[in-house]
Amino acid sequence: MKTLLVYYSYTGQTKLIADKIKSKIDCDVVELKPVIPFSNDYQEVVDEYQNNESDKKCIEIEELNVNLDAYDKIIIGTPVWWYSITPVLREFLNKYDLSGKKVYPFTTNAGWLGRTFKEIKGHCDVKKELNVQFTEDWREHKYLTSDNEIKEFIESIL
């Protein structure tokens, strides 16, 4: 069985958790990237995507350099933007068929999960999910979720 970890990270929070997972699981890693990068100005991105506007935004993502058919398990990581998945992950889920894959999503947020997992489950068969809550100051890179919860999530994938 091969495992692929696919994630998008804007502020670095999701990458932090992806790296933690990668350190414990033998898996290939793909960082999803929009063709046209988002602004480096955090407030500008918040203003553009607030009020669930991200649901309506279609963006193009860079092509994956892997063949998804080669993987049995897919770990998906995304920040939560306005109670939902990011436009980057939404495009990935719309573009790639994950039928027959065991999918393990994790999210990062400051406490506002919303409908994120429900939206992911609308695209694929979720085996186990993990919500990693960070402090409200995204620059701190400090999560509040227990290491034990993260460990249990990782063990469920093994």
What residue ranges belong to the model's regions?
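Glycine-rich phosphate/pyrophosphate-binding loop and the adjoining helix
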Residues: 128-158
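Conserved beta-strand segments of alpha/beta enzyme cores
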Residues: 26-28, 125-128
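Redox-cofactor binding/interface segments in oxidoreductases and associated redox assembly factors
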Residues: 76-77, 105
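Short, conserved loop/helix-junction motifs that constitute active-site signature segments
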Residues: 68, 94-101, 123-125
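N-terminal beta1-alpha1-beta2 submodule of the flavodoxin-like/Rossmannoid cofactor-binding fold
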Residues: 1-76, 83-85, 90, 94, ...
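Short, aromatic/basic amphipathic alpha-helical patches
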Residues: 116-124
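A short, structured active-site edge motif that brings together acidic residues
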Residues: 33-36, 104-110, 130-137
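Short glycine-rich anion-binding loops that position phosphate/pyrophosphate groups of nucleotides
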Residues: 79-82, 109
